[in-house]
Structure formats: C-alpha cells, structure tokens
C-alpha cells in the first residue's frame, strides 16, 4: 500500500479542490492511461442506463462533473434536454466550459461552481436525473451529499453513481490492489513529470469508501428505492443506480 496519509476530514475538501485544480489539464489523459480507455465504456454505460429508464426531455445534474466527460455524453443523448454541470474545482470546470462551449451557447448546458454537500442554489425536486462519475468518494460528508442529491431529484427521478468498487475474489483483489496502489501513482508521476501526492490520494481514497453492498444500504437509508449496482472489471469499478420514490397519489 502507499505511504500516503489521507487528510483529516475537516481538511479534505480543501485538499481535494486544491489538488484537482493542479492536475486538471492532465486528468483526462490520466484516466485514459490508468483505465486503458475503459472509463469511456463505463461512462457510456451510465448514459445508456438513463436512456433505458426514461422516455426523454430530461433535465440532468452532472455533479462533480470534473472536465465534463460525462456531461458531454449526456448532452449528446437525444433523451436529454438540458445538463447542469457542477464541480468545486475551478480549473476542472473551466475545461468543461471549453469542451461544451457550443452546447452552452445553445442553452443546453449550464455550469455552476458548487459543493456536492451544499446544493443550496437548486430547488427541491428540480432534476430528473443526477449523475456522478468518480466523485462521490471525494466528498467530505457522504451522507450529506446523498441527502442533497435526494432532495434535488424529482419524485421518480434517478441517481447514478460510477466509482471504484471492492473486488471480492482474493487473488484478483491482490492483483487489482497492486495495480491501483503501486502502478497507477507511477503512471500519474510520469504524466505529471514528477511526484504528485494527488496520484497517491486517488487510490488511497478508495480505502475509506463504502463497498458495493454498504453503499447500497446507505442509499436505501437516505430514502432511495430499487437500488441496484453493476460491477465492471471484477468489481474494480461499480455503477449504482437508485430511484427516488414517486409521490403518492
């Protein structure tokens, strides 16, 4: 395992924001390298899951949107009318704005600098769908973030969360951990041109993040129903899908 020590909870948000700002320009290439381009497949699957559950005209909140990789896929979907992109890294959000400039000019995309645990700029029941890609484990208060997601979703709306998972098979887990904790940081150093603690943080942050079943229980505790998940690459990555209950008639 890496010798990197996670920042204390009250310093985590500042650490994450500062360091994502630093690596923003290299982040997409880093994802390509460390996932062998598979992150693109997983993100496409997230969008297809939305399309399989709705008829169209969707207003989507892409939370922790980063450089807009999922936002772009959502905007390209004929099922989506509007995407609101939120991140608390200014530099990440600037890249998303550049990437989606034409779509924003058409009024199909909107950008907000914001914190996933304090979505005060949004009304209750405002969005049909909320998506997060590899961002939930970076928040400093998981329960608060999920509570906010639940609040801004319309009744019957859907939350989709793509992030790291836990591999159950011990032999595969050993290989996965070796790659994630030893090789992935080195790939980051090569890309960065030197050592950078953010590339150590990314794998270490997975240690305190809930496994598939635990996150499912947390989502249900916060009020979500029909919570399911799909594993990719033996559970190294997982997509959770959860529904907010419809209003009683």
Curated annotation (Swiss-Prot):
Molecular function, one GO term:
demethylmenaquinone methyltransferase activity
Looking at the keywords, is Methyltransferase present? yes
Record keyword Transmembrane present: no
Record key words, sorted: Menaquinone biosynthesis, Methyltransferase, S-adenosyl-L-methionine, Transferase
Q: Which PROSITE patterns match?
A: SAM_MT_UBIE (PS51608), UBIE_1 (PS01183), UBIE_2 (PS01184)
Q: Which Pfam families match?
A: Ubie_methyltran
Q: Which domain of life is it from?
A: Bacteria
> Which residues of the sequence carry a binding annotation for S-adenosyl-L-methionine?
67, 87, 115-116
Its BP terms in the Gene Ontology are: menaquinone biosynthetic process; methylation
What are the EC numbers? 2.1.1.163
Pathway stated in the Swiss-Prot or TrEMBL entry: Quinol/quinone metabolism; menaquinone biosynthesis; menaquinol from 1,4-dihydroxy-2-naphthoate: step 2/2
Reaction catalysed by this chain?
a 2-demethylmenaquinol + S-adenosyl-L-methionine = a menaquinol + S-adenosyl-L-homocysteine + H(+)
Q: Which family does it belong to?
A: Belongs to the class I-like SAM-binding methyltransferase superfamily. MenG/UbiE family.
State its role: Methyltransferase required for the conversion of demethylmenaquinol (DMKH2) to menaquinol (MKH2).
Query: What name has this protein been given in UniProt?
Result: Demethylmenaquinone methyltransferase
> What lineage, starting at the top, does this entry show?
Bacteria, Pseudomonadati, Spirochaetota, Spirochaetia, Leptospirales
